[in-house]
Amino acid sequence: MVTSMLPAGLVASAVVSASSANLGPGFDSIGLALSLIDEITVETTDSGLVVQVEGEGADQVPLGPEHLVVRAVECGLRAVGVRAAGLVVRCRNAIPHSRGLGSSAAAVVGGLAAANGLVAQANCQPLSDAALIQLSSEFEGHPDNAAAAVFGGAIVSWIDRGGQHPRYAAAPLRLHPDIHLYCAIPQERSLTAETRVLLPAQVSHEDARFNVSRAALLVVALTERPDLLMAATEDVLHQPQRAPAMPASAEYLRLLRRHNVAATLSGAGPSLIALTTASALPPEVMEYGAANGFTLAEMTAGEGVRWSPGVTVVG
């Protein structure tokens, strides 16, 4: 592929949602976008790289070429066959980092989408949603958060390993309108790579059967039968194994479920996601969270990633 140079002075922006993966049994496959957003603005320049970050993670992320958004922007440009001599990348983050809310997927999807906004000004064909999912999942290693960030709402995703390279794909689900979403976000952090090593390399047929049945039921519960959410969010493959690494979240999870709230770890934790048809959580649940350092927030399903040439103002 012949690579052409983008002119200096192009500006593009993207708005991308947080996401919760797994939702109990849907390990590495089911995801749900949430109404927390990161905003990204990218400008082409004659040379150099400037990265500016405000909000979540501002004092923790690298401000150079290794920044995830920078890597994703460059990946998106490369995929289309263009490059930029220099970039200014500005990130305004509301998605907490290392809490199981898809901050890395949002950074990658947002960076790729911002690249779309640049290439659209150079008479190039922007990346399709399928390409956004493929490229962002290659960064992540699994498509659940990435696909939720691309499509918005609830999704089911899968990996096809039949070819030379894994192919990642997803299909959107129509989330039932009676489902209310809550996130419980602790101060403590957890890295997916650190908790993934707690999972066994092999599982029993009994446990596999259990999770397959619950994952199938979860699709039904999310779309048609929210009264089945408690049973549909049961899991034996990853949450019990991760619990010792995050005792406060594990205890809060048990409390929520004792009060008939369909709660799970959000991704690898330590945040929790709760799905309920009730208009509010039980008072005991609210009080426990506040007393134990959790920020409890009602959410709605997040939108799919949005990109545009120029700067998008979020209302």
From Swiss-Prot:
GO cellular component: cytoplasm
Catalyzed chemical reaction(s): L-homoserine + ATP = O-phospho-L-homoserine + ADP + H(+)
Family: Belongs to the GHMP kinase family. Homoserine kinase subfamily.
Species for this entry: Mycolicibacterium paratuberculosis (strain ATCC BAA-968 / K-10) (Mycobacterium paratuberculosis)
Protein name listed in UniProt: Homoserine kinase
Biological pathway: Amino-acid biosynthesis; L-threonine biosynthesis; L-threonine from L-aspartate: step 4/5
EC nos: 2.7.1.39
Principal localisation: cytoplasm
Keywords assigned by UniProt, alphabetized: Amino-acid biosynthesis, ATP-binding, Cytoplasm, Kinase, Nucleotide-binding, Threonine biosynthesis, Transferase
One GO MF term attached to the UniProt entry: ATP binding
InterPro entries per UniProt: GHMP_kinase_C_dom, GHMP_kinase_C_sf, GHMP_kinase_N_dom, GHMP_knse_ATP-bd_CS, Homoserine_kinase, Ribosomal_Su5_D2-typ_SF, Ribsml_uS5_D2-typ_fold_subgr
Residues holding ATP: 96-106
GO biological process, one term: threonine biosynthetic process
